[in-house]
């Protein structure tokens, strides 16, 4: 079973993401801050990370930058930031995909599966 780390400070959104992952046979953990997400990502073996950008403390851009120093797994940014400049910045920092909120849970799962397939 593939394992996904959800780094998301909004508990409702994290629950929606987790629920759809579970239904699609993924295991998942949730981190509510950037610092916690970095610690969990480095301490465990995840297959993919769903990363919010607007987090308390360290923002998602800095989390992505830090994780890319050591991890080679898919990172999908899931955020309310809809400006092209944010999308470009995220992709340039090493994100594999960029999804804006509100999102279709079915599209999220399709992108998770697609990103994982590219890393296999």
Predicted ranges, named:
Residues 1-120:
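N-terminal/domain-start alpha-helical segments
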């Amino acid at each position: 079973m593939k394992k996904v780390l959800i780094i998301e400070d909004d508990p409702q959104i994290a629950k929606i993401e987790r629920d759809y992952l579970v239904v699609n046979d993924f295991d998942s953990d949730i981190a509510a801050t950037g610092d916690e997400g970095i610690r969990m990502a480095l301490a465990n073996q995840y297959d993919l990370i769903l990363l919010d950008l607007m987090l308390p403390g360290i923002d998602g851009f800095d989390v992505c930058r830090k994780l890319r120093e050591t991890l080679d797994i898919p990172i999908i940014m899931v955020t309310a930031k809809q400006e092209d400049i944010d999308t470009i910045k995220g992709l340039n920092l090493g994100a594999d995909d960029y999804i804006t909120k509100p999102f279709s849970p079915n599209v999220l799962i399709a992108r998770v599966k697609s990103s994982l397939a590219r890393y296999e």
